[in-house]
UniProtKB/Swiss-Prot annotation:
Source domain of life: Bacteria
A cellular component term, taken from the record's GO annotations: membrane
Function according to Swiss-Prot or TrEMBL: Involved in the biosynthesis of lipid A, a phosphorylated glycolipid that anchors the lipopolysaccharide to the outer membrane of the cell.
HAMAP family according to UniProt: LpxA
Subunit structure as annotated in this protein's UniProt entry: Homotrimer.
EC number: 2.3.1.129
Name the record gives this protein: Acyl-[acyl-carrier-protein]--UDP-N-acetylglucosamine O-acyltransferase
Pathways per UniProt: Glycolipid biosynthesis; lipid IV(A) biosynthesis; lipid IV(A) from (3R)-3-hydroxytetradecanoyl-[acyl-carrier-protein] and UDP-N-acetyl-alpha-D-glucosamine: step 1/6
Similarity remark: Belongs to the transferase hexapeptide repeat family. LpxA subfamily.
Length: 262
């Protein structure tokens, strides 16, 4: 179903069954598969493939040569009905690839709202991306990677499969991430390691002075106290009773499976 207010260039192919909502603009030479749904006011520039079971929200901008919802690169994939979900207000720049999920990973690759994926970003199967993230040119995420809100990943960085990246993290360009990165941290290198806190980012996002001081204390517990991760977790839980923001560290350490960068 194509809404009457949608604009579709005559050179584009939209298979029967696709749902195109109001004021969507599909530019020239695009292909949209039968199981795709595209939300209102989303713009597809040109030469874009959207395939598989793919749901795209409202007010997204998708640039030329992007490929969304294609078969993933997991050799175990056997044509199961897995999918991708993309939220609202995302900018997906040239040649970005986002692959559908696998049955082993929850069946969905999921993108939140208001993210910017620059040229040639690759988001593999089963990745879960939060809101307000920025991934610079040529960032590559392996399968099952989770990236929390307000994370910035520098260009040419690769993130190993199953890694977890916390909220408000900044990763420098050309890094190789092989372990989990706790929230609020600046990381860089191959293999990536911690280089302090993303203080400037926290200030820009309105964190109070007391919250920033508490986060500094949490960083010292995690990285300068010679505690084990479990020992640090106990100390962080105690600190969180006075400063609830520290629960982000506690929750992250609970979720972490690959160990944290240290």
């Amino acid at each position: 179903m194509i809404n009457r207010s949608a604009i579709v260039h005559p050179s584009s192919i939209i298979e029967e069954g696709a749902i195109i909502h109001s004021d969507v603009h599909v530019g020239p030479f695009c292909f949209i598969g039968a199981q795709v749904e595209i939300g209102a006011r989303t713009l597809l520039k040109s030469h874009i493939v959207v395939n598989g079971i793919t749901q795209i929200g409202e007010d997204n901008q998708i640039y030329q040569f992007a490929s969304l919802g294609e078969v993933n690169q997991d050799l175990k994939y056997a044509k199961e009905p897995t999918r991708i979900e993309i939220g609202n207000y995302n900018q997906i720049r040239e040649s970005v690839t986002i692959h559908r999920g696998t049955v082993q990973g929850g069946q969905v690759t999921k993108i939140g709202n208001s993210n910017l994926f620059m040229i040639n970003v690759h988001i593999a199967h089963d990745c879960i991306i939060g809101n307000n993230c920025i991934m610079a040119n040529n960032v590559t995420l392996g399968g099952h990677v989770k990236v929390d809100d307000y994370t910035i990943i520098g260009g040419m960085t690769a993130v190993h499969q199953f890694c977890l990246v916390g909220s408000h993290v900044m990763i420098g360009g050309c890094s190789g991430v092989v372990q989990d990165i706790p929230p609020f941290i600046i990381a860089q290198g191959n293999h990536a390691t911690q280089f302090g806190l993303n203080i400037e980012g926290l200030k820009r996002r309105g964190f109070s002075r007391s919250a920033v001081h508490a986060i500094r204390d949490a960083y010292k517990i995690l990285y300068r106290s010679n505690k084990t991760v479990e020992g640090a977790k106990v100390a962080l839980k105690l600190l969180s009773t006075e400063h609830p923001i520290i629960n982000e560290f506690v929750d992250f350490l609970t979720r972490s499976q690959r160990g944290i960068i240290r």
